């Protein structure tokens, strides 16, 4: 009997129920992945006990000689991964990383130009309900009806707005982002260029997506999603002047003592990302997503932008009589988890939507390849083409569980 099972069986049992859900269902939420046992092992270590306010070699607390080495290792691996000169590995999340960037580069009230949330952006790119849209004067660009960014349109908006900072990057954009064009736009109006690569970072470091360096002044990311590490954030730059401002913005500006056990998890994750196997994984993520999208289009479904260049697709139901929420619920009943998502030309509320976002990273981590993704796409189509057929959903759920049992990801809940 484990310590947790003995002391708090309620939480132990719920954790194991979640393990069973992760094992039995097909996880296709684009922002989720399955991290490595080694990452979870170090995150559950005694490192959680240590306070380490400050940075390596410049701490406010004593006894930091070993955690200094851990954080410096994470920094060095991060720099090597992205090919940059400076990295801050302390942000507790991607959202905090983004707020840290704003704190370093602009002042409250300054203008920012980001991707509209309903067009594929993120809350932290200036949405009015988020701190980024409350502390700063936020303006937006979006996608055209073909689902793609029109860079000439972005340039026109930038000339009118004259932002201090432009945000490029997205949470639901299936096409490659042209950082070079964004830099031309930023330079034309004298703006800083900030790339949020949280979704595509795992592809970037494998050479499967253009690197935001040297085009961007600053880059942020999460460390989970396509990087497959622990939940957390990072900020990177090539300029020492910017690095100093970023460090001050994170500590003492936003955070106190960093989560040392998570920083260690980031270091372990980065070691995986630096391995030769990572390039193979990233290629497979893209290949799996492509056949997923191609198969759904063959079955008559509309994909935003007509396909994908990365790890996700957006399926539009604007021409259907059901919503993204309906589709998400039906698929979950069939053992497939996705999320409802707004699409270009959206007519429904953000709580209902007219689309779903579907990702390939997590199932690729389980070892699935094109054959499995083609099968899954056909099952998704079967469910959606008869969306109210609960008997069919139950039948497919059993088939999904059988497939999932052949690709075991974890044999226990705690490491």
Swiss-Prot record:
CDD domains: SHMT
Reaction equation(s) it catalyzes: (6R)-5,10-methylene-5,6,7,8-tetrahydrofolate + glycine + H2O = (6S)-5,6,7,8-tetrahydrofolate + L-serine
Positions bearing N6-(pyridoxal phosphate)lysine: 225
Primary localization: cytoplasm
Pathway: One-carbon metabolism; tetrahydrofolate interconversion; Amino-acid biosynthesis; glycine biosynthesis; glycine from L-serine: step 1/1
GO molecular function, one term: pyridoxal phosphate binding
Family label: Belongs to the SHMT family.
Its biological purpose: Catalyzes the reversible interconversion of serine and glycine with tetrahydrofolate (THF) serving as the one-carbon carrier. This reaction serves as the major source of one-carbon groups required for the biosynthesis of purines, thymidylate, methionine, and other important biomolecules. Also exhibits THF-independent aldolase activity toward beta-hydroxyamino acids, producing glycine and aldehydes, via a retro-aldol mechanism.
The protein's name: Serine hydroxymethyltransferase
